[in-house]
Amino acid sequence: MFTSEIGVVEEWLSEFKTLPETSLPNYATNLKDKSSLVTSLYKVIQEPQSELLEPVCHQLFEFYRSGEEQLLRFTLQFLPELMWCYLAVSASRDVHSSGCIEALLLGVYNLEIVDKHGHSKVLSFTIPSLSKPSVYHEPSSIGSMALTESALSQHGLSKVVYSGPHPQREMLTAQNRFEVLTFLLLCYNAALTYMPSVSLQSLCQICSRICVCGYPRQHVRKYRGVSSRIPISSGFMVQMLTGVYFAIYNGEWDLAQKALDDIIYRAQLELYPEPLLVANAIKASLPHGAMKSSKEGTRCIQVEITPTSSRISRNAVTSMSIRGHRWKRHGDTELTGQEELMDITEVDEGFYSRAASSTSQSGLSNSSHNCSNKTSVGKNQRRSGGSKAGAKERETAGESCRDHFARKQTQRAQSENLELLSLKRLTLTSSQSLPKPSSQGLAKTAATVFSKSFEQVSGAPVPRSPSPAIGCVAGADANRFSACSLQEEKLIYVSERTELAVKCQAGQQGPPSISVTLSAE
């Protein structure tokens, strides 16, 4: 070490001893910016025979147990270098030169296994389940797991891994050495995002040295110093891979790649399945080109996350979908029913309008007085209420005009009924049936046109309407009527009304008639 570096370390040691507790947070914040101090401390740790090693280890332990977060992280950044020095000294069997480093490692370990109240810590980790989403997968992207997902989540099949409680250690032995070191490396990995680049570089170099020392690859790497093999555990190698994996994506591509290859090399020699599985998975996921991430940016492991999708499948049966399906089905049914009723109503109205117009025209032949009023049939129906002025005008009409008008109306009624019959045969087939009389069909929606004269009131015989005969059909087809049969019945009814009107004209002058139209809608 140079004299300047020794002076920086000695100044750091003396400064902390005279520092009051109130200014400790400001001191911890400014400490991480002293790069020259960090470099000098690395050199002190790398020289086991240095006189400054013991006070430096003591100072780092005081930082760690102070409770200040910044001072704790400052100590953790030297942890990989301290482990390497301890393992190197242990491999060379020089136990006396590693006493202060061993004490520091034991002190950090004993502080980490207990909480603030002095109780043992129990660390837990929940292994991700395929039924629940994570940063690596979405359950909906795997496939249709509607039933499987709910079943797995309800049964609670997620596996939880526990670590602890860990026992207190007073000294490091060959039996508990890697148990302590593995836990310390776990604590270091928990604070990886706060570690500077110098610490990540030290981690990668130490991982390579530990894995190749005493093996033929040591000559390829040209590592000097320790030439004996350093025993290592499977769990410790897995923790090394965690730190190396982070360093790959945070500016240390070359060193981390080299360390990854050395870890795979050592795991193959030791036949450790856990580090082989993790290391090969990391290597298979690496990009082909070097990662050029900024050392000053945010430190994190880059993971490609699939876009989130809806957890509810489009084909999933829910209460809303069932309710919507019912609404849609009822809406279609009601719409279809309304359309059918409209179709029937249109047919009924067409059938009724023809028959009603012909019947009304034949019934009004006795009360009409002017040939010019023969085209307005609807107005004559409304005006046939029996006003006195209309009655006087009808009494003064000539006999010849009434006979001529009656003959003409009879011919027109017959021609219109024949035309209606031909049209109905085109639109309605003879096989089409009408609903039962109890339902709202054509039999009830059709108009019932009747005309009562003052002669009927006085007791004169009037031919009965043939409409009741329509429903009196024997046999299995009692409720089925064809369009032709209905038209023929209506034609007979119209012809009878026409003959009756002609006979009444010859006997006496026709009194006013009342025409009522009933339609059940």
Swiss-Prot record:
Tissue range of expression?
Predominantly expressed in the central nervous system, where it is found in neurons but not in myelinating cells. Lower abundance is observed in peripheral neurons, where it is detectable only at early postnatal ages. Expressed in both oligodendrocytes and neurons.
Q: Which GO terms describe its biological process?
A: myelination; phosphatidylinositol phosphate biosynthetic process; protein localization to plasma membrane
- DNA repair keyword on record: no
Q: Which residues carry this modification: Phosphoserine?
A: 321, 415, 422, 433, 453, 465
CC terms in the record's Gene Ontology section: cytoplasm; cytosol; neuron projection; plasma membrane
Phosphothreonine carried by residues: 306
As for subcellular location, the record says: Cytoplasm, Cytosol; Cell membrane
Stretches with biased composition (Basic and acidic residues):
390-406
Using the UniProt annotation, give all residue ranges assigned to the region (Disordered): 355-413
> According to the lineage, what is the superkingdom?
Eukaryota
Q: What induces it?
A: Down-regulated by beta-catenin.
Output the Pfam families linked to this UniProt entry: Hyccin (PF09790)
Keyword terms of this UniProt record: Cell membrane, Cytoplasm, Membrane, Phosphoprotein
- In the UniProt record for this chain, what is stated about the effect of gene disruption? No visible phenotype. Lysates from total brain and optic nerve (a pure white matter tract) display a selective decrease of Ttc7a and Efr3a protein levels.
Q: Which family is this sequence assigned to?
A: Belongs to the Hyccin family.
Q: How does it assemble?
A: Component of a phosphatidylinositol 4-kinase (PI4K) complex, composed of PI4KA, EFR3 (EFR3A or EFR3B), TTC7 (TTC7A or TTC7B) and HYCC (HYCC1 or HYCC2). Interacts with TTC7 (TTC7A or TTC7B), interaction is direct.
The protein, known as:
Hyccin
- The UniProt gene name for this protein comes to Hycc1
